[in-house]
Amino acid sequence: MTRLRGHLCRTRSNARGAAIIAVALAVGCGGRQNVNGSSQPEETPERTLPQSDVWVLEAGGTPPDDTTYTLIAGQRRVVVLRNGAPDLATFAVLTFPDSSLKAPEGTQVELTVRVRPGVYGVDIDCKAETVGARLVFKYARHFEAPNAAEQKFGSATAFEHDLAIGRLNDDGTILLLPTRRPNQDNLSAPIRGNGSYVVAGPK
């Protein structure tokens, strides 16, 4: 089943296979103007909700593989997770500025990223404290709104409007982080330590 909505192409696939992860140096660029004329994207408010009060955005396509990478303290890096063949679409991007790792310069730091099955979500485990790192989910290709969400909101488009990146807490709540939309079908939020991060919207 394929859904088309403007700039969004929604597809479903049950195939699984190897995914590709690419690591590259970040390249700075100017912010996209929002509807208010500001060069900085607007942010959603930070709030905490019971996990039972949100819908997590489902993901089709072949998911990225889990991966472990070695970061170097003092060096800026971008880690890109891609869906598997055939499309190799970007699934998520983790950005670590040169000052983000709280470790002596030159220290090797292990980072493990595991993709949560069937949804736009990752489990992050970094062996050093991070400050200023960010996570971006890119969902244009394999967006799948939960059926109940579409029934409530009337369309996948309406559900998408309220999406944010959240961090799952051990007490059964989700912290919806201040989330930006740097581009269409992209959500960006700060990484608040190790844990599970998902794209979700309130019920």
Which positions does each model-derived feature cover?
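C-terminal beta-strand-rich structural cap/linker in extracellular carbohydrate-active enzymes
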Residues: L187-K203
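Sec-dependent N-terminal signal peptides
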Residues: R12-A22
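Proteolytic processing hotspots in large secreted/extracellular or virion-associated proteins
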Residues: E46-T68, Q75, P104-N169
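C-terminal motif of bacterial Sec signal peptides marking the signal peptidase cleavage site
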Residues: A26-G28
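N-terminal secretory signal peptides that target proteins for export/translocation
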Residues: M1-S13
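Predominantly extracellular/luminal regions of secreted and cell-surface proteins
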Residues: A73-T107
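Surface-exposed loop/edge segments in extracytoplasmic proteins
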Residues: V122, D171-T179
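Bacterial signal peptide processing site
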Residues: G30-Q33
